[in-house]
Each structure stands twice: as structure tokens, then as C-alpha cells.
């Protein structure tokens, strides 16, 4: 067995809150370290916040994101951590996940499929990265791999599906499977909608089964920018089995969910699959090799404990109530309001609720 402890971090971020976002990222990394996790996935665009809208087109946003990345990088020594940020490359802005290995930037994976329906307008700000294309990103005299990449970290291969990438028919995970990927990280900013958790569970479970991998899904939490609610809900699966699930609609700003996965078990599962055909070109330019020594960990049996309301008869009503409560609470504190005024449709006096602050 080759056991690895992985972690999915759920964060309640705010657009352009450079200090607060960095503090929450560092807190998540520290919590994962305390749990002895080696591989940590944080949400999509967690450095800037997902809801920056047209501020993504400001060079200051790009520069501050890179500065924050450099400030966080030393805190990842002895770990493998993914962070989300916008990256400017060849005059195109890309929604990227940066993989940091033992305190050094290993490279960047750019999102291939942009969310452009419903409440999402990613094509307004970002460019989709084409499949099988790799390049070098040059920043401050240094060069970093970027594009449709995967990473070989001490013999364990790690790839990415960034949020929408996993929701499409031609999802990148199939190509990652042919590259013998062991762990797929999915940093997401997936807003709450009724029944959406079941869809997420399906693509996480099916991705881990069909691609012969362990799958780590990390999501945003809370009312990030005033219009969309994120429910959190980290998920970790391996070989088609769900082995860990985090709480949803939490009022905590940082949550870390961990699980121990066996990469040798998923490798042999894929080897037994007659339809699986590995890529055998004798060296794949998309794979970034970097040394890393995984610490020994003890096997831990999965013990998923869903909240009672998640398995009750009134899930939809519970979701609505919890989503509204979290959304209003976050709006109150992030806008620094003193309270809400609730007006009844009658001649009775209005009812005013105040915060303790």
C-alpha cells in the first residue's frame, strides 16, 4: 500500500480582501498540517475571491494575487498545496490553479471550460485554455510551467479539473487517466442550488471510479460577494467510493476535511480495467516532475457522518433556511451593516434586528 493523506479546504472568502483571504488560506494550510495531510486542495480563485467581476481586468488585481501567492508559498514546506488565482499570460487572462510543492511553485494549470451560463460570466474575464497545449510562464525573471499540465510529485501524479471542467461531457479527467494520474484535485466555486450536492457527488464518485483515481473536491462557502451563496461541502472519493464529506452552510470561515487514500489500490484497479489504455509515447511534455517525499501515514477507515438534516425528509426546506441564514449573516458582516429592517405587509410597526457589533 502507498497511503497518502489528502485534504479539501473550504473557505469563506471576500473579493479583493487581500489580508483576510491570505489569513484564511494560511489557517487552512495550518489546519491541514495539524491533520498531517500531505496534499491540500483549496477553492477556485481563493486568493482574489471568485466574485471580483471586472476587477479581474485590473493589473493591480493580477499583481496583488501574485504577491499573495509568493507570501503564502513558504508556509507550504513539507506539503503539496493548490491555490487559485488569475494569471496573465501572452495578453490573455487565465483562471489558474497553482500547485506548490514543498515551498516551491511547481507550475500552473489553466481552466479549460469556463462557466458562462446562469449566474456565471467567466468568458467575460478569462480565456479558455486549449487541450494538450503547454507553455512557460515568465514572471520576474523566473519561468514556470503553465497550461494543460499534470505533476509527478515523488512518483505520485496529480492533475486538475477546475470546477466547470468536471461538469462537461468531455471532461479533462479522461486525458488525465491516460497519463496515469493518481489524484485529481478539483478547486471549485460552485454556488448553491437545490439538488446540486447530488450532482457533485455523482461526478466526484464517477470521476474517481472511471479514471481510477482519488478525487478531492474543495468549494467556496458563504455569501462571497453579495449575490451568490456557496454551500461548501468538501468531498473526497477514491476508486468510486466516497471516503469523506465536509459540512455545508457552516458559519466557520475555514473548514478542512481529510481522508487517507491508497494510490496503489487505484492503480491496480485501473490495471484490471480491460478498456484502459495508458499513454505510451515515451515521455509526455505535459508532465512536470518534481521531487517530494510523502510521510508515512496510518490507514484510516472512512467514517462519513452526514448531518441529520442532510438525510431527513425536508432537505429542500433545510437547505433554503440555512442558505438564507448564512447569506444574510455574511452580508451583514461583510458590508459592515448594523442590522436589517424587516417590513411586514400590514399597518403594524416595522421590526428591526440589530447585530451585536
Give a label for each model feature.
Residues 1-357:
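Enzyme catalytic cores with a strong preference for nitrogen-chemistry domains
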Amino acid at each position: 500500500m502507498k497511503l497518502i493523506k489528502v485534504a479539501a479546504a473550504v473557505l469563506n472568502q471576500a473579493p479583493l480582501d487581500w489580508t483576510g483571504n491570505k489569513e484564511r488560506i494560511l489557517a487552512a494550510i495550518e489546519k491541514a498540517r495539524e491533520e498531517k495531510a500531505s496534499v491540500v486542495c483549496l477553492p477556485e480563485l481563493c486568493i482574489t475571491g471568485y466574485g471580483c467581476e471586472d476587477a479581474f481586468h485590473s493589473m493591480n488585481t493580477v499583481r496583488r494575487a501574485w504577491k499573495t501567492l509568493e507570501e503564502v508559498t513558504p508556509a507550504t514546506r513539507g506539503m503539496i498545496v493548490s491555490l487559485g488565482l488569475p494569471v496573465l499570460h501572452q495578453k490573455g487572462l487565465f483562471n489558474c490553479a497553482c500547485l506548490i510543492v514543498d515551498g516551491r511553485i511547481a507550475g500552473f494549470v489553466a481552466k479549460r471550460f469556463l462557466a458562462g451560463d446562469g449566474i456565471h460570466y467567466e468568458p467575460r474575464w478569462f480565456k479558455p485554455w486549449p487541450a494538450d497545449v503547454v507553455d512557460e510562464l515568465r514572471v520576474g525573471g523566473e519561468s514556470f510551467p503553465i497550461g494543460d499540465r499534470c505533476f509527478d510529485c515523488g512518483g505520485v501524479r496529480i492533475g486538475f479539473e477546475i470546477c466547470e471542467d468536471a461538469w462537461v461531457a468531455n471532461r479533462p479527467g479522461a486525458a488525465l487517466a491516460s497519463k496515469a494520474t493518481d489524484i485529481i484535485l478539483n478547486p471549485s466555486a460552485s454556488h448553491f442550488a437545490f439538488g446540486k450536492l447530488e450532482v457533485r457527488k455523482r461526478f466526484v464518485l464517477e470521476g474517481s471510479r472511471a479514471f481510477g483515481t482519488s478525487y478531492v473536491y474543495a468549494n467556496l462557502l458563504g455569501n462571497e460577494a453579495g449575490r451568490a451563496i456557496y454551500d461548501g461541502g468538501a468531498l473526497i472519493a477514491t476508486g468510486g467510493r466516497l471516503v469523506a464529506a465536509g459540512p455545508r452552510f457552516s458559519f466557520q470561515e475555514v473548514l478542512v476535511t481529510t481522508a487517507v487514500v491508497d494510490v496503489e489500490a487505484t492503480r491496480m484497479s485501473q490495471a484490471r480495467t480491460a478498456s484502459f489504455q495508458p499513454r505510451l509515447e515515451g515521455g509526455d511534455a505535459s508532465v512536470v516532475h518534481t521531487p517530494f517525499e510523502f510521510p508515512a501515514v496510518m490507514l484510516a477507515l472512512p467514517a462519513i457522518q452526514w448531518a441529520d438534516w442532510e438525510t431527513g425528509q425536508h432537505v429542500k426546506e433545510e437547505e433554503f433556511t440555512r442558505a438564507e441564514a448564512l447569506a444574510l449573516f455574511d452580508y451583514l458582516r461583510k458590508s459592515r451593516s448594523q442590522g436589517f429592517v424587516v417590513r411586514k405587509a400590514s399597518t403594524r410597526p416595522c421590526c428591526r434586528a440589530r447585530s451585536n457589533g
